[in-house]
């Protein structure tokens, strides 16, 4: 973590979405209160309804034959934010509602660091949890009783920064960086299409180029519940395709836990970390092993 930089005066939030309209509405409602006047760029991926709802700050992204273009959509949203003069880029997942200090803490952290990926804690809200109404700046924190950050990632005390983060823990649920750092990293690799791999790839790029992962205390986000599969069986084709992209670029397999679990279920066939073999299981080849 290097020396301080000038304080951002024109931050922008970038969100990519396909469906999840109610989640996006909660996010937009909270942003309007906790960060009034801050530009919110929404990238609608193959979602004409969303494109109509989000007004002038929407970027439309057509469908891709292999899946949702998550990496390309984030790049397009950031390009739009930079073109509009943003001096701090905040990527916020469509399922995430910003805590009352998220933007302020990212702006503070960016002023204290240079060449960094800034990541705040994310709390996964349990099923059935209602998203509370936003509170105006200076008011009580409506999420205080719900805050329980993901245990696999650091959650520093409010206002504290923890540099030297493990690049393998980088995720794009909630992250901030300057346009200069974004340009240095080159954005997300658009060879990744669909689910899995693009975040891990950017974490490796950052590490290779000496860009630190810094955990930002107090920059809380709250992930709204939606059903998921563990392991993500429905995304197996994306995972296989994107894992091959990652291995070609970096010489190793990503997402080893998922590959191992999906192989055990008979959904795909993976020969292990030292093997070249990774493919979807053939019809009739499935079954636990």
Q: Where do the model's predicted regions map?
A:
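Short beta-strand-to-loop acidic/aromatic patch adjacent to the donor-nucleotide binding site
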Residues: 86-97
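Short, flexible, basic/aromatic active-site loop/helix in glycosyltransferases
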Residues: 121, 138-168
């Amino acid at each position: 973590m290097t020396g301080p930089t000038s304080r951002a005066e024109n931050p922008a939030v970038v969100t990519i979405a396909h469906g999840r309209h109610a989640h996006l509405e909660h996010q937009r409602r909270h942003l309007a209160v906790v960060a009034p006047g801050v530009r919110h760029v929404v990238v609608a991926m193959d979602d004409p309804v969303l494109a109509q709802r989000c007004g002038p700050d929407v970027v439309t992204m057509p469908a891709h034959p292999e899946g949702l273009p998550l990496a390309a959509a984030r790049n397009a949203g950031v390009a739009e934010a930079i073109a509009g003069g943003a001096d701090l880029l905040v990527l916020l997942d469509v399922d995430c509602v910003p805590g009352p200090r998220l933007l302020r803490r990212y702006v503070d952290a960016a002023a204290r660091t240079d060449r960094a990926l800034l990541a705040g804690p994310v709390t996964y809200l349990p099923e059935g949890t209602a998203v509370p109404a936003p509170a105006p700046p200076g008011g009580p924190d409506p999420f205080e009783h719900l805050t329980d950050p993901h245990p696999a990632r650091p959650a520093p005390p409010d206002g504290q920064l923890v540099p030297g983060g493990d690049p393998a823990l980088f995720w794009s649920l909630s992250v901030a960086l300057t346009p200069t750092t974004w340009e240095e990293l080159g954005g997300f690799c658009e060879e990744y299409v669909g689910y899995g791999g693009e975040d891990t790839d950017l974490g490796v790029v950052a590490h290779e180029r000496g860009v630190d992962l810094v955990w930002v205390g107090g920059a809380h986000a709250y992930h709204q519940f939606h059903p998921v599969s563990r392991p993500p069986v429905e995304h197996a084709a994306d995972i296989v395709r994107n894992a091959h992209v990652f291995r070609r670029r970096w010489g190793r397999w990503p997402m080893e836990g998922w590959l191992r679990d999906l192989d055990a279920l008979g959904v795909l066939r993976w020969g292990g970390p030292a093997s070249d073999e990774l493919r979807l299981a053939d019809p009739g080849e499935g079954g636990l092993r």
